[in-house]
A protein has these predicted regions:
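Glycine-biased, small-residue-rich flexible motifs in mid-sequence functional cores and linkers
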Residues: 2-235
Length: 235
């Protein structure tokens, strides 16, 4: 079993065919660093599954089950490997043999958060990928989390929000998704303490509200049918 440190850190430039299509179109960064199979980004449909670190019991269940469903549908899961919703979604996807892409806000010689070190190894073991805009030695800075949130949207065709506070990093990704004309969805929650961001999106009419598994399946179908880089009309 390979350890995280045994996977080489490689780089790809914007003139290489394996450079993420979405970032070529929307990002000013000409170099991306990665571990694992970067071709995965362009080869599959990707949905970012994101949410709060302070996850509720219901949010934990929804994140895990969403990851499972995406894996069964052969959709690659994208997020920032954060504690809470991100990690649970990854665990669900990996449990069904799915592929995951984790976007780091730092150099790839480290895993952020450190608590998800083993989960990062599992992503790579299962044929997934970890990417970063930052070279080895780049420290963790607050603004880099916001830039990471932008990348999550750039490399995804759809964004699914499990539960989020309205002032969270998750909502940064939602805002980027709207600017980039990406498909956006969020789960409906009766209890809004940890999900007032979901309520904000629901009331805005700019996200598909997921109340049932059939709603989720419909969202996946819509994302799966989209042509690459088509300018999308928000749901």
């Amino acid at each position: 079993m390979k350890k995280f440190d045994e996977y080489p850190i490689l780089a790809v430039t914007s003139d290489d065919e394996s450079y993420p299509f979405g970032m070529r179109k929307m990002s000013n960064n000409s170099v991306i660093y990665y571990k694992g199979d970067i071709s995965l980004i362009n080869a599959t449909k990707n949905i970012a599954v994101i949410g709060t670190r302070k996850i509720s019991d219901r949010g934990r269940k929804l994140a895990y089950e969403t990851g499972c469903i995406l894996a069964k549908r052969k959709i690659t899961l994208v997020n920032g490997l954060a504690l809470g919703c991100d990690a649970e979604a990854i665990k669900g996807a990996l449990s069904e043999g799915g592929k995951c892409i984790a976007v780091m806000p730092c150099g790839l010689e480290q895993v952020q958060p450190r608590l998800n070190y083993r989960l990062a190894e599992q992503i790579l073991e299962k044929g997934g990928c970890m990417i970063s805009e930052y070279p080895v030695g780049s420290s963790i800075q607050k603004y880099r989390y916001v830039e990471r949130d932008k990348v999550q949207s750039e490399i995804s065709q759809g964004i699914m929000i499990i539960e989020a506070d309205e002032n969270s990093g998750t909502m940064h990704t939602a805002e980027f998704a709207m600017r980039q004309h990406k498909r956006l969805a969020c789960y409906y929650h009766k209890m809004i303490e940890l999900s007032n961001g979901n309520l904000l999106l629901e009331n805005s009419g700019k996200a598909k509200v997921i109340k049932t598994q059939s709603d989720l399946e419909e969202f996946i179908d819509i994302v799966g049918e989209e042509k690459e880089f088509q300018q999308l009309t928000l749901l």
